[in-house]
C-alpha cells in the first residue's frame, strides 16, 4: 500500500531536511553518559547512545530538543578512536578473553581473540598490542578486537619501556651486528694521530662521536685567534649507501636515549667500538678546521678533511668542571697537554658565549632530569642536572662546527639536512605582538614598542633576536613561557634557512653521525664535495622521516617518564608530601604544576582551587585563571603543592595547591 508512495517519500525527505546534524568527538564521563564536543558547543549524550560509541570516536549525530534541554542521537561513525591499540589482558567468568584499553578515558571492556602468530599463553594482566575489528556503528556488531602482538608479562618491571616502545612502534633491540665491517674509503685520509685530541663526555658514554683539539693562532708572539679542530666519528666509511645498515639507520633516524639504557641507531659494534673515538685507538674521522678571532668571530672558510685521529684522553664533564671552577680537592688533569687543551678550550668557549650573547641567542638554563634506576627497573632517585662549564665547552664547539657545516653545504653542495626554525607561527605574529604590548608597554613607550614588536619585524631573524634580548631581564617567567605557545615547530629542510630559536642564519648538524641519521647524510654530502662530485639533493622522504622519528622519540621519552614518576611518587601519597612547584600549564580542567626537585607533573583540578565555579574564569590568551576578577594562577608562577593521589593504571598524579 505504501510502496513507492510519492507522498511518503516526500514526507521522509522533509523529516530528513528538518534534522539538525552535528559532527564532533565523543567525550566519556565517569558516569554512563557522555558529551559530544563540537567546534563551538558541547551536547549531552544519554547512556543508551553511549553504548554505541567509545571515548574519542568522531561521529555524526542528530540534535534532539525537549523543552529547554538538548541532547544528541548518534547517527554514524566518522572515525573510530581505536585502530591499533595497547591493552591489558583479562578473562571473564566464562574464561573468555577480554581487553582493557590502556587509555585513561576508555572504560569499555572489549571482547577479543588472538591472531595465530601470537604463540605466548596469555594470562591476566599481560600487555598486548591489538587491532579493533568491529564497531557497533560501522559493522552492526559489538566492539571486538584481535590480539596481534604480545609485549610482556604483567609482572615485568620493565613494562614502562616495552609497552611505550610498542605503543609508538619503536624497536626495542639494536640493529644486529654484521659478520664483519670494511672501510670503504674514496678519499685519502690524512694522518692526524699526532694531534692531542680529547673527548669530554659522561663517564658511562660508549658512543663517543666527537673529539677536539685547539691551539692559538699567532702573528709573531701575539695571539690573534683560535684554531679549533673538530674530529667527528665516520660511520659512513663502514656503511655503503643503500646497504641494509643504511636502510635500518634511515628508519630509526636517532639513537633512542631512555632512562637506564639506550637503543642505538647503528649496531653496537659500530656505535660503541669501531666508530667510537675511544682513547688511544686509531679511528677514522671527518675533521673540520675552524678559525676565529679572539672575539669569537669565524674567520675564513672551514676546511674539511678525511683523516685518522687518536683521542689521547677521555675526560668527564664533572671532573673538568670541578677543575675549572676550582672546587676543593677537585680532579686535576693527568698531563700538561691535557691541562693545556682544557684551558685553551675554556678561553675559546668564554669568547664564543659572549659572541652568541651579542650576535645570536643563548639557551635559558633550566636543568635536565635523570632517573637513577635499580637493577630491577625501579626508581632509586631522580636528579636534576645543570649545564656546567665543561658541558658548555662541548656545546659551544659543536654549535660553531654546525654553523660552519651549514655554510659549507649551502655554498658547495647547495643542499643538506638543515636545522631550521621560523620562530613565531605566521598566524600568531599579531597575537604575539599584542601579548608583548599588553605585558610591557606603558602610555609613554607604547608607540615605540608597537614599532619594535611589529609583526613583520618579529618574522625576521634580526627582529626576533632583538625581541628575545629585550625580554631577557623581565623578572617573571610567564612572559617567555606564554610566548613559546606562539612558536612554530623546528623543521628539517634541504635548503638553508634561519634557525630563529638559536638566533643563527644557517645551521646543519654533522657532529653526531653515530646517533643521528641526518648527520650521516651531511657527512656523505661533505665527502661528495671533497671528491668534486655533484651533490644529490636530499630527498623529501628523508626529511619527513627525520621529523616523524624525532616526534616519536620525544613521545616515547615522555610516556616512560610519566610511568616512572607515577611509580616513584606512589609511596609518598600516604605521607602527603609537599613540593615546591612551578605552574607549567593552566587549562579549563585545572592547573598542571612541575615539581622543581624532580620534574614530575602534578595535576590540580579546578574544583580544589575555589568552591564557586561561577566566580572562576580561565583566560587562554594569558594561560591564567582568574577568581572574582583577580588573577590567581598563571603559567610560570611558583606554588606549593601537596600530593594527594597517584593512579598507577593511568599514570596520573594529582595534588592540591596549598
UniProtKB/Swiss-Prot annotation:
Pfam families on file: OB_RNB, RNB, S1
GO cellular component: cytosol
Domain S1 motif: residue ranges: 576-658
Matching Gene3D superfamilies: 2.40.50.640, Nucleic acid-binding proteins
Alphabetical list of SMART domains matching this protein: CSP, RNB, S1
EC number annotated for this UniProt entry: 3.1.13.1
Keyword set, alphabetical order: Cytoplasm, Exonuclease, Hydrolase, Nuclease, RNA-binding
InterPro entries: CSD, NA-bd_OB-fold, RNase_B_OB_dom, RNase_II, RNase_II/R, RNase_II/RNase_R, RNR_Ribonuclease, S1_domain
A molecular-function term among this protein's GO annotations: exoribonuclease II activity
Catalytic activity: Exonucleolytic cleavage in the 3'- to 5'-direction to yield nucleoside 5'-phosphates
Class of the enzyme per the UniProt entry, highest EC level: hydrolase
GO BP terms, alphabetized: mRNA catabolic process
RNB domain residues: 189-530
Subcellular location: Cytoplasm
Zinc-finger listed as a keyword: no
Coiled coil start-end: none
Family, as annotated: Belongs to the RNR ribonuclease family. RNase II subfamily.
Protein purpose: Involved in mRNA degradation. Hydrolyzes single-stranded polyribonucleotides processively in the 3' to 5' direction.
NCBIfam families in UniProt: 3_prime_RNase, PRK05054.1, RNase_B
Protein name, entry field: Exoribonuclease 2
Annotated organism of origin: Actinobacillus pleuropneumoniae serotype 5b (strain L20)
Taxonomic lineage of the native organism: Bacteria, Pseudomonadati, Pseudomonadota, Gammaproteobacteria, Pasteurellales
Gene this protein is translated from: rnb
Amino acid at each position: 500500500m505504501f510502496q513507492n508512495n510519492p507522498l511518503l517519500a516526500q514526507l521522509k525527505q522533509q523529516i530528513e531536511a528538518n534534522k539538525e546534524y552535528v559532527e564532533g568527538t565523543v567525550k566519556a564521563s565517569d558516569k554512563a553518559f557522555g558529551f559530544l564536543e563540537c567546534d563551538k558547543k558541547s551536547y549531552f549524550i544519554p547512556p543508551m547512545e553511549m553504548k554505541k560509541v567509545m571515548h574519542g570516536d568522531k561521529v555524526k549525530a542528530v540534535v534532539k530538543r525537549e523543552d529547554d534541554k538538548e541532547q544528541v542521537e548518534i547517527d554514524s561513525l566518522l572515525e573510530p578512536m581505536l585502530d591499533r591499540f595497547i591493552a591489558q589482558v583479562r578473562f571473564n567468568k566464562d574464561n573468555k578473553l577480554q581487553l582493557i584499553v590502556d587509555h585513561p578515558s576508555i572504560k569499555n571492556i572489549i571482547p577479543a581473540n588472538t591472531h595465530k602468530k601470537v604463540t605466548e599463553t596469555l594470562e591476566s594482566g599481560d600487555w598486548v598490542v591489538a587491532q579493533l575489528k568491529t564497531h557497533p556503528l560501522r559493522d552492526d556488531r559489538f566492539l571486538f578486537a584481535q590480539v596481534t602482538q604480545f609485549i610482556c608479562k604483567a609482572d615485568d618491571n620493565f613494562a614502562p619501556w616495552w609497552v611505550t616502545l610498542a605503543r609508538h612502534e619503536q624497536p626495542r633491540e639494536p640493529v644486529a651486528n654484521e659478520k664483519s665491517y670494511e672501510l670503504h674509503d674514496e678519499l685519502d685520509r690524512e694522518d692526524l694521530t699526532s694531534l692531542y685530541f680529547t673527548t669530554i663526555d659522561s663517564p658511562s658514554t660508549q658512543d663517543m662521536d666527537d673529539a677536539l683539539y685547539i691551539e692559538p693562532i699567532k702573528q709573531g708572539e701575539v695571539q690573534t685567534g683560535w684554531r679549533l679542530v673538530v674530529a667527528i666519528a665516520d660511520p659512513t666509511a663502514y656503511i655503503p649507501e643503500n646497504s641494509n645498515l643504511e636502510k635500518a639507520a634511515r628508519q630509526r633516524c636517532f639513537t633512542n636515549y631512555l632512562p637506564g639504557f639506550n637503543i642505538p641507531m647503528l649496531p653496537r659494534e659500530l656505535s660503541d667500538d669501531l666508530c667510537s673515538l675511544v682513547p688511544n685507538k686509531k679511528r677514522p674521522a671527518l675533521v673540520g678546521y675552524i678559525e676565529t678571532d679572539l672575539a669569537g668571530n669565524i674567520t675564513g672558510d672551514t676546511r674539511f678533511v678525511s683523516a685518522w685521529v687518536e683521542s689521547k684522553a677521555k675526560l668527564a664533564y664533572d671532573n673538568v668542571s670541578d677543575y675549572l671552577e676550582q672546587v676543593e680537592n677537585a680532579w686535576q688533569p693527568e698531563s700538561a697537554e691535557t691541562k693545556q687543551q682544557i684551558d685553551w678550550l675554556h678561553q675559546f668557549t668564554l669568547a664564543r658565549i659572549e659572541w652568541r650573547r651579542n650576535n645570536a641567542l643563548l639557551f635559558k638554563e633550566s636543568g635536565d632530569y635523570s632517573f637513577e634506576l635499580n637493577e630491577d627497573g625501579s626508581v632509586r632517585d631522580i636528579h636534576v642536572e645543570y649545564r656546567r662549564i665543561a658541558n658548555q665547552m662541548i656545546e659551544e664547539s659543536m654549535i660553531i662546527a654546525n654553523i660552519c657545516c651549514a655554510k659549507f653545504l649551502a655554498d658547495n653542495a647547495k643542499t643538506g639536512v638543515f636545522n631550521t626554525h621560523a620562530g613565531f607561527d605566521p598566524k600568531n605574529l599579531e597575537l604575539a605582538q599584542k601579548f608583548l604590548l599588553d605585558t610591557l608597554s606603558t602610555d609613554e613607550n607604547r608607540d615605540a614598542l608597537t614599532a619594535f614588536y611589529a609583526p613583520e619585524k618579529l618574522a625576521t631573524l634580526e627582529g626576533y633576536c632583538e625581541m628575545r634580548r629585550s625580554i631577557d631581564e623581565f623578572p617573571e617567567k610567564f612572559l617567555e613561557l606564554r610566548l613559546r605557545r606562539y612558536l612554530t615547530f623546528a623543521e628539517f629542510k634541504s635548503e638553508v634557512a634561519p634557525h630563529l630559536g638559536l638566533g643563527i642564519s644557517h645551521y646543519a648538524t654533522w657532529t653526531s653521525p653515530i646517533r643521528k641519521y641526518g648527520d650521516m647524510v651531511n657527512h656523505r654530502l661533505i665527502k661528495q664535495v671533497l671528491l668534486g662530485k655533484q651533490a644529490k639533493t636530499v630527498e623529501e622522504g628523508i626529511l619527513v622521516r627525520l621529523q616523524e622519528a624525532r616526534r616519536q622519540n620525544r613521545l616515547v621519552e615522555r610516556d616512560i617518564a610519566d610511568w616512572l614518576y607515577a611509580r616513584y611518587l606512589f609511596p609518598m601519597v600516604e605521607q602527603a608530601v609537599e613540593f615546591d612547584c612551578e605552574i607549567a600549564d593552566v587549562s579549563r580542567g585545572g592547573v598542571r604544576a612541575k615539581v622543581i626537585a624532580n620534574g614530575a607533573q602534578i595535576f590540580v583540578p579546578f574544583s580544589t582551587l575555589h568552591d564557586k565555579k561561577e566566580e572562576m574564569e580561565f583566560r587562554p590568551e594569558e594561560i591564567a585563571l582568574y577568581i572574582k576578577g583577580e588573577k590567581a594562577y598563571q603559567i610560570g608562577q611558583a606554588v606549593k603543592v601537596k600530593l594527594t593521589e597517584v593512579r598507577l593504571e593511568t599514570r596520573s598524579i594529582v595534588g592540591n595547591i596549598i
